[in-house]
């Protein structure tokens, strides 16, 4: 009598039977699929080649002999096959050539026959990866930053050795995201990122949040596990759509190959519409590996032209079409308030830089109305700081004279700003003179802004003008009257002379002062031409000194992390900026702590001959944190001191040239060597600097006029 276990074993077929049964089912399934294709393509379809019936206990003798003959044919031809190359060819690199904009972004149809009855047939027979490549071409994408992985390989295979793209492979996906940001900030075009699923996608979360905070257009494409595996905790599966929901303007998972072109178009349009920002498109592997078999709506393959698309500064002829206009009556009301003002001030932000016309209109407004100008950190370069009406940057570490002027102005003209806490200080005490003038009906706050949620979110505006800032400026400037405001300009000038940016110069035998290094860079950049320079920074004290002691004169010459304050931003963003503008000097002013977070991207610059220059401040401290510990935590330096590597040797090990400056008398010569070094190779100039505080400084919870001044100025403060 059989045991229960024996009876169960008898029910399990032998392994070869299971394999044979599976092959038979697969063969029958393939036959049905092949028959369906032939039937749909023609009425007189020939019979499938493999039409010999499969019997339950094996193939017929005729079928077996046909298989053996096929194997013999393969074996006989194997000896004559060409050997595969030992090293796959690399795409040509053209980073040192100035980018040439395409004449049009419209799709390039081979013939009218590809569109019939509103349906497009041009993508039939292409894989999802090939469709991705074609859509990038239609969106004039020339540079892609990313890192491959299993889930995104169908796309990487489609763009392999493509002559249409310059692909930059970073050492970390976060580097790819910041490179795309730097590229977008300098070029005005959205940066494109291509990464795999799981950690590849989550490593781009920080750059996406950074781009969202600062209004940078970026399109991130990430791989995903196959749709039938979603939710199964598959290898490198992550709910990146859920994770990125709060740090993108829009995100989507493409679930069918037929919707891929439409989703790509939507991504580019949303990233560049209104206030620019990041978007994410999740691409399951079975979608990018699939073949499109049916026509799709013709409109879905045509790049959408956003009416508010920022212009490309590298192509001045590219202008936004039909920008969102501001309310004409409100603009007229704003002009009337400005014309009556005795002490107006212009507060310019990143929104002014959305078009090449923005800085021009800002200058015209300031010159015509004799109005002083201050900027946000991200507005640097919108107004020439050599102009006598420039008050430089405002805020926590802005100029003392800009902060004082903001508190005294009776009309505040805010252009494309968010009024974040680093600018306003204590909100209740921000711009008191303008608020008092508003209560008396003779002044107030005018806010030009494209994003509705920023209107009256922090600071109440008496005249809120919702719309494209540059378009609104174009309507405002003709209505501004020439008014004599010499008394107000004179007061601002006197305050500027009384409270300048100040530091104690280094003495012989002492370490360099970081301010001295920035001033020397500014002096030599002025001699070479400021229009030839782009400056990026990390985050920390060095970032603030760059704002204070470098005179900003050119739009889109400043690349820095403002809203999120991302350490490690400087070097990868400089690489992206250099890719966008290879003809310019691109300099990353960085601190030792910030640089160390993404220092390996120096190897990326070496690999691709991207000639970025790193001006590195080494004080072996996390400087800004140490400053707060000094001022507010009784000098308790909790985990802010660092032991650094030899940055010169580290740079040389990654193919870059390394220099080190320790003396003030050597600084001009070494700065000159630094700037004149080969524009195709990266270089690092390490400057050993003393530990300093950044002044002025507005302590948390204090008003703009309650700023901490440099000790040399405090006796004369008001």
From Swiss-Prot:
Cofactor note: Binds 1 Mg(2+) ion per subunit. Binds 1 thiamine pyrophosphate per subunit.
GO molecular function term, any single one: magnesium ion binding
Gene3D superfamilies: 3.40.50.970, TPP-binding domain
Single GO BP term: isoleucine biosynthetic process
Compartmental location: Mitochondrion
Compositionally biased region (Low complexity): 76-99, 306-325
PROSITE patterns in alphabetical order: TPP_ENZYMES
Reaction(s) catalysed by this chain's protein: 2 pyruvate + H(+) = (2S)-2-acetolactate + CO2
Protein name: Acetolactate synthase, mitochondrial
Species this protein is from: Cryptococcus neoformans var. grubii serotype A (strain H99 / ATCC 208821 / CBS 10515 / FGSC 9487) (Filobasidiella neoformans var. grubii)
